[in-house]
Amino acid sequence: MVKLALKSGVIASVLTAAAMGSAFAAGPDRARHDQISFEMVVSAGAHNCLPDAKAKVKIVSTGTAEDMFISATGLPANTDFDFFVIQVPNAPFGLSWYQGDVETDDKGDAFQHFRGRFNIETFIVAPGVAPAPQVFNDQPFPDAAQNPMTNPVQTYHLGLWFNSPKDAQDNGCPNTVTPFNGEHNAGIQVLNTSNFPIDAGPLRSLNP
């Protein structure tokens, strides 16, 4: 996770918050076929230490890509988190990719906007084995030297992790180290989409 200048971060937060307000204004009664809204719930591992953590997500398709708007509350204040698109919501999580960062304000609220492919066609594929760059090699999760071959695997779930095990510990959570940040030394998962079936995560329902 790379820190940006504070001024830029504040401006981005204001713009994202404005976009969030517009995105959620329609409400569930005005949902269209090209957008979905759903909630993320607190993960089992964070239930005791962050019982009020939750998030609302809205995804709007423009056809060529989707805009995802996230509004999270009940998180520790001024804390960094990492957001992933994942195969299944709970451990072992399956195939996953690092979508971006989420940072809370002094009230423990966070707003974020991502643009990418977040619908029924979201998948990971590796037609063959190939060498992979080994950049972050610290234990316990060093970079792999090559990828495994896999047919297309659909990834319809979402998850949010503490960027740091210390941040987790400082907030009464387990200080378990996980690979879910840019340098593969994150804390535990905080939010996920386990309120949806394993094979039918929320992204599956968006079919523009």
What are these regions (language model features)?
Residues 13-14, 66:
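Generic hydrophobic/packing signal
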Residues 1-10:
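Bacterial N-terminal signal peptides that target proteins for export
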Residues 24-208:
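N-terminal leader/targeting pre-sequences
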Residues 15-24:
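C-terminal segment of classical bacterial N-terminal signal peptides
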